[in-house]
Amino acid sequence: QYGSSRRYAEKLSEQTGIPAVSYKDAPDLSGRSVVVYLGSLYAGGVLGLSKTLRGFSLQDGQKLILVTVGLADPCEQENLDNIRASLRKQLSEKLVDRAKVFHLRGRIDYQKLSLGHRTVMKLLYQSLRRIPMEKQTAENRELLETYGKRVDFTDFRALGPIISEIQGKTI
């Protein structure tokens, strides 16, 4: 919605030749040998994931690569656990277990958020400020530190392992 996933998808498309298509226009995926889904993390879910993969089942020889894009640092195990839990809320456990999952960091510019998103972020920020810092999760501490600012963690080099997975190279 704000561009990080789209920027990653376009760069991935340039480097692999796989077309970047919005989840709103996703074609039938059943005949594809490799399905790559890049989606933004919003409020505990991946935007468009359920809609795109509704009724999808992985066939023999098919590869599903799920890529989440958000502000959470994927080097923090707690963040990885939270992201995986959100995937399990949207997809069957079997599909998540068979998928290769990657996490990329995106960007946020609070000035460009919709009124609704700004309001939600403000309420979240105000709620988190009431919790003692030593009880905050790493993700929440980062949100408190960056609230109201323009932050960009985009790193196209992070696409390397995803490209290797698409090409069938062991990573």
Regions inferred by a protein language model and the residue ranges of each:
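N-terminal beta1-alpha1-beta2 submodule of the flavodoxin-like/Rossmannoid cofactor-binding fold
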Residues: Q1-G61, L66, P161-I171
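FMN-binding flavodoxin-like domain, especially the glycine-rich phosphate-binding loop
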Residues: G44-I171
